[in-house]
């Protein structure tokens, strides 16, 4: 999404919803091998700055629950999040960064 659009995504890894205990497991180094393959494939496009390594590992983790990332104009973000929450879906909605 970012590369094709010629933009940069700035994510706050602490705002990303993770599975319960995922951060603690990552701190212990319990990361699947596929995460390292993903990092090798797309790492050239990512500047992790001073992000703690365990969060970086989680971002490359190939195990997902069907997560969805959408981008909306800043002035529409609150309304979109409210709409998701009103639907009563069993999902987490979070504003995790900016374009």
Task: For the regions a language model picked out, list residue spans one by one.
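Glycine-/charge-enriched secondary-structure boundary and capping motifs
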Residues: 1-99
């Amino acid at each position: 999404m970012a590369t094709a659009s010629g933009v940069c995504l700035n994510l706050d890894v602490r705002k990303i919803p993770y599975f319960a205990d995922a951060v603690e497991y990552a701190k212990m180094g319990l990361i699947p091998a596929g995460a390292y393959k993903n990092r090798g494939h797309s790492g050239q496009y990512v500047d992790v700055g001073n992000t703690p390594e365990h969060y970086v590992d989680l971002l490359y983790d190939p195990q997902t629950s069907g997560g969805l990332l959408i981008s909306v104009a800043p002035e529409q973000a609150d309304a979109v999040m409210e709409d998701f929450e009103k639907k009563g879906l069993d999902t987490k909605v979070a504003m995790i960064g900016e374009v």
